Structures are given as structure tokens and as C-alpha cells.
Curated annotation (Swiss-Prot):
GO biological process: cortical microtubule organization; defense response to virus; negative regulation of protein transport; plasmodesmata-mediated intercellular transport; positive regulation of defense response to virus by host; regulation of cytoskeleton organization; response to water deprivation; stomatal complex patterning
Protein name, as recorded: Protein MICROTUBULE BINDING PROTEIN 2C
Keywords for the protein's UniProt record, in alphabetical order: Coiled coil, Cytoplasm, Cytoskeleton, Plant defense, RNA-binding
Principal cellular location given in the protein's record: cytoplasm
Function noted in UniProt: Prevents homeodomain proteins (e.g. STM) association to plasmodesmata and, consequently, cell-to-cell transport. Binds to RNA. Alters STM RNA binding capacity. Regulates cytoskeleton (e.g. actin) organization that determinates cell shape. Regulates stomata patterning and drought tolerance. Involved in restricting tobamovirus (e.g. oilseed rape mosaic virus) infectivity, probably by interfering with cell-to-cell virus movement.
Annotated region described as Disordered, given as residue ranges: 1-46, 71-132
PANTHER family documented for this protein: PROTEIN MICROTUBULE BINDING PROTEIN 2C
Matches recorded under InterPro entries: MBP2C
Comp. bias (Polar residues): 1-15, 34-46
Organism (species): Arabidopsis thaliana
One Gene Ontology molecular-function label: RNA binding
Length: 326
């Protein structure tokens, strides 16, 4: 391939490729000099050479473009195209004069060169067709790869969008979960506070219940005590009535004599010998003890307490001690 490109460059150098005034640049009005027209004896061969050169010149940019942009495994080395400047008209005139002097040798060389150019052109056509086919295949393969990549990219974008939506949903769920946890924590604190208040209320209720039971017990005890006091009071009143009768009997020193005599036999009372020995001092003490006992009993009735009852009991015992002496 590199040799073919070098051959193309040689042809371009010989035919004046690269100048704006060259016939290869598309100037159809440019005519050869008289010396050059005299040197070209075979016009058909010249037309053939021009067509081949034109085709080759049109193929060179395609090959160069392909070699610059499409690296193939079979063409790992790249050759660079070197464009030479077209000779001036004066140099072309000099070359025409020199060519007119050597026409027979030039014809022979031109004939051989034309054969080589035709062979090379056929090879170049085949190579160009092969390169064009390979380029088409490469372009098709690249298009397929690009389409596949675009499809994969679209799928990736869809996956990313789906992941983004899922992430947003997860974030929303996480926020809702955190809000729910906060509400649950607040409810737990409220429940604990209510439980503490309920415990305090239960304790207070138990205290009140105990106080009520104590009050009921005290009331019951007080009622029982009142009954006992009433019984004791009744007994004391009975004793007082007994002692009163005794004192009234003792207070009578002599009996009342009748105004006149009766024939009936008087009733004989039993004699109480222990009353004869009682003097006035003992009777006065017993009377004072009786009055003190009566006062103690009255006080106990008014107050209804243990102290009054104790005093009444002491007064009764003192009175009994005086009475039972005789």
C-alpha cells in the first residue's frame, strides 16, 4: 500500500498535481504548449492517462481519510501523503523542449509507463472497492454498536430514573417512619406520665381507705366504750340508790312515838347491832364520800371520758370502804 501511494505521488509530481492552473485541478481551458503537443503522438493514450490520473486523484483523499480515521488490523502502519507544488509554466516549457529532443525514448517509456499505470489502476480499483466495502462494513458495525450503546444508555437512564424514584420513595418512607417514631415516643411518655399519676392516685386512695377504716374502727370502739360506760353508770346509779337508802336509815336516830296507846301489838324490827357503834364523825365522812361519789358520777356523765370514770370509780371504792367497815 505504501508503494502504491509513493507511485501516486510520483505520478502527481510528473503531471503537475497540486497547482490551481493544472489540468488535474479542473481547468478545461488550459492547453498544452506547442512543444508538448508535438511531443504527444498518441492522443488516445494521453486521454487514458488523464482519466486514470483523475480517478486516482479522486481516490487518494478517500484512502487517506480512511487511513487517518479507521485503523484496521491489516493496515497497522499509516503512510502520509506528500503533495508537491506544481511546476511553473517556464519549467513546463523547459521540460517540453527537453522532451521534444528525446521523443523516441520518451515514447517507449511512456508506453511502458502506461501499461504499468493501467495495471496499477486496476489494482487500485480493486483495493479501493475492497476498502470501500470494508469501510461500509465498518460503518455498519459502528452504527450497530452506536445503536446498541444508545439502547443501553437509554436502559441505564431508565434504571437511574427508577432508582432515583425508589430513593425518593425510600426517603419519604424514612421521614414518615421517623415522624411515626416521634409520635410513638410522645405517646409512650404520655402513657408513663398517666401511669405515674394513676399510681399516685392509687396510693392516695389506699391512704384514704386506711383512714376510713381507722375511723370506722375508732367509731366502733367508741360505741363499745360508750356501752360499757353506760353499763358502769347504771351500776353506779344502783349503788347510789342503795347507799342513799342506807344513809336515810342511818340518819334516823330514834323512831317516832305514837300519840296514843294502841291495843295492837307493835311490829318488832330486827335489831341492827352494827349501826349502834357508828358515831357522828363516821356518818359525816360517809355523807361526804357519798356526795363526792355523786358528783364524780355526774361529771362522768357529762364528759364521758376515761379520767372521769376513773375518778368516779375511786370515789365509789372510798365510799364502799367506809360503808363496809361496819
Amino acid at each position: 500500500m505504501y508503494e502504491q501511494q509513493q507511485h501516486f505521488m510520483d505520478l502527481q509530481s510528473d503531471s503537475g498535481f497540486g497547482d490551481d492552473s493544472s489540468w488535474l485541478a479542473g481547468d478545461d481551458d488550459l492547453r498544452l504548449s506547442p512543444h508538448q503537443s508535438a511531443a504527444g503522438t498518441n492522443s488516445g493514450n494521453e486521454n487514458l492517462d488523464r482519466r486514470l490520473l483523475k480517478d486516482l486523484v479522486e481516490m487518494v483523499p478517500l484512502i487517506e481519510h480512511y487511513m487517518e480515521h479507521k485503523e484496521r488490523s491489516s493496515f497497522k502502519r499509516r503512510g502520509s501523503m506528500i503533495y508537491t507544488k506544481m511546476p511553473s509554466k517556464e519549467s513546463l516549457s523547459r521540460r517540453g523542449r527537453n522532451a521534444s529532443q528525446t521523443v523516441p525514448g520518451r515514447k517507449k517509456r511512456d508506453q511502458e509507463g502506461n501499461d504499468d499505470v493501467m495495471n496499477n489502476s486496476r489494482e487500485d480499483d480493486e483495493n479501493a472497492k475492497a476498502l470501500a466495502g470494508a469501510e461500509k462494513e465498518e460503518m455498519s458495525r459502528l452504527r450497530e454498536q452506536v445503536n446498541d450503546l444508545q439502547t443501553k444508555l437509554s436502559e441505564k437512564e431508565e434504571v437511574l430514573k427508577s432508582m432515583e424514584m425508589s430513593k425518593n420513595q425510600v426517603n419519604e418512607i424514612q421521614e414518615k417512619l421517623e415522624a411515626t417514631n416521634r409520635l410513638v415516643a410522645e405517646k409512650d411518655m404520655l402513657i408513663k406520665s398517666m401511669q405515674l399519676q394513676l399510681s399516685d392516685t392509687k396510693i392516695k386512695l389506699a391512704d384514704k381507705q386506711a383512714a376510713l377504716e381507722k375511723t370506722q374502727w375508732e367509731a366502733k370502739t367508741t360505741g363499745t366504750r360508750a356501752i360499757k360506760l353506760q353499763e358502769q353508770l347504771d351500776a353506779v346509779e344502783g349503788d347510789i340508790s342503795t347507799f342513799t337508802r342506807v344513809f336515810e336509815t342511818l340518819a334516823k336516830t330514834d323512831s317516832k312515838k305514837p300519840d296514843r296507846d294502841y291495843d295492837a301489838v307493835p311490829y318488832e324490827f330486827d335489831h341492827l347491832p352494827y349501826l349502834d357503834d357508828v358515831d357522828e364523825t363516821d356518818l359525816r365522812k360517809m355523807e361526804e364520800a357519798r356526795l363526792a361519789y355523786v358528783a364524780a358520777v355526774n361529771t362522768a356523765k357529762e364528759r364521758e371520758d376515761e379520767e372521769s370514770l376513773v375518778m368516779a370509780a375511786q370515789a365509789r371504792a372510798y365510799l364502799q370502804s367506809l360503808a363496809f367497815t361496819y
